[in-house]
């Protein structure tokens, strides 16, 4: 999903990407290979999160004056990342259909701190017991200001709406 979004935006914006993981640089390398944008890996030494200080140190590797958008892909769980401020202007999270529409009930903080929630793999709705409207209702009950968008990385559905949101929010900064 991230690579698909970057590939659609990179003609309009100068984009950088940071990937956070415990070990390896596989994710950063994958993003760089698929998109051609500079991507660096932040190794978090076994922690389940990163914070603004770690991001600040990683920013030294970028010429931020020549970036229009810097994307930080945090650790992929729904608990720890919500508890720590990364210094990001906006928080975006990804919930996929196979994970279930009950995730907002189980991990409320992540949904409370997210500005945009993308519900991915909507092309698989017929195969899973996932109620999109119920998931959206649960998210908005926790965070009335959140924007909830259905997307499919596979088909591209919804990606233009995500890009529109990113562009509008970027203009507000």
Regions inferred by a protein language model and the residue ranges of each:
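Residue-level signature of catalytic and energy-coupling elements of molecular machines
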Residues: 21, 73, 120, 135, ...
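N-terminal/domain-start segments enriched in small and hydrophobic, helix-friendly residues
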Residues: 106-130, 166-167
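Inter-motif core of Ras-like GTPase G domains
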Residues: 81-98, 107-119
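Nucleotide-state-sensitive switch-loop elements of NTP-binding domains
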Residues: 1-89, 102, 111
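Canonical P-loop GTPase G-domain recognition
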Residues: 124-173
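Structural beta-sheet core signal
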Residues: 17-19, 93, 117, 150
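Short glycine-rich anion-binding loops that position phosphate/pyrophosphate groups of nucleotides
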Residues: 75-77, 97-99, 123-124
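Short, glycine/polar-rich helix-capping loops at beta-to-alpha or helix-loop-helix junctions
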Residues: 25-29, 103-107, 131-137
